[in-house]
């Protein structure tokens, strides 16, 4: 399939109608969430994927904004024919709580004062960020996500989703992440924060409308950027080459190409990011710890999703052993977990760069989809003793076109469709057994969606009850949802 762009993308906003209670016990009012979406949500809303950004990312994950030449930060894997195929999936990305790209953060106006929050903004956590994302997903009318995916701090959000809202996540993809921030990771973040707060322009966080602490923020970015690279990538990219000169100057000017590169990264970063947001988001990363009583096994116990954990061979900030610890903890909980490594010299940033490997690994993971991954588990059912009138009312109130019919022992004995109800009215039938189909075509949770779709096509039906070994109904899948996922839909 030819890979393409999602084209022009726009950012939308949504404001919470109720106060947001934070993990710290503080509350935020009128929280605004900035988000973008790509692709089309199918009829039964079963194809939604939430993408979570890293520390300094934003909601602009794919496509272009107007005349901007720079695409979204994960454009290489989001779009037609890519891993997050927008011909199949409805992809959502929102700016995190505490950020500075449209979602409420320290640079936002405090409704109580009419001025920017600054450091009066409460400290937030990864769990708080996920709770805000959950509110957005509820707003979009989505009861369950087909997948949640992200790298670095985005991967932490994925892991938090798995334990905070286990029933809402069918598949999870966490890349270059950890289940618990380590002392080394906390140490690097603290150096960055001190660089900012030591800048005289920081003014205790009250610098809005005045000179911003660009020197401190630039230095924080320079330090952090070193951790995103690797020794090998810096050797390849820079070596010991000098910048714009042939000989050493024997002074303290910027001489080496690697120095010039870091200065450029720091300076450009100050033009797009808020220093206070950097303080808050790094603190949220430091607080991240999913272990319970020092046990990741206990921490991941609520997980129900099928999980893909990806690490980067040259990542020394979030090294592979930390991803392997997550895999071990999930395996100990008998979760369906898969693991792979990006073989790359680019270090931690490989999750943004190695789009070829990512497209391959993520596509294989998402495409191997079982019925249980996409079925609707909130299925209205009716007893075989019910009347046609009861069935008709239930279809109207529940907004469904198919009603599985159950025997007294709760086993499946038939199915009634909206066409059957119309036929009953036309023919004057009154009894349910006069119209229901007793030879029900079914599927199981362990079948692939391709097999289920083929069965519906063969029998010219639009839905399949999903049954267990006792013939009990555990879900239902529709042709509309499956067609989108397997690429047969519009």
Curated annotation (Swiss-Prot):
One of its GO terms (cellular component) is cytoplasm. The keyword Lyase does not apply. This is Homoserine O-acetyltransferase. Its main location: cytoplasm. Its EC number is 2.3.1.31. It is found in: Cytoplasm. Keywords: Acyltransferase, Amino-acid biosynthesis, CBS domain, Cytoplasm, Methionine biosynthesis, Repeat, Transferase. HAMAP family: MetX_acyltransf (MF_00296). The active site is at residues 152, 315, 348. It comes from Methanosphaerula palustris (strain ATCC BAA-1556 / DSM 19958 / E1-9c). SUPFAM superfamilies: alpha/beta-Hydrolases, CBS-domain pair. Residues 375-432, 436-490 form the CBS domain. It catalyses: L-homoserine + acetyl-CoA = O-acetyl-L-homoserine + CoA.
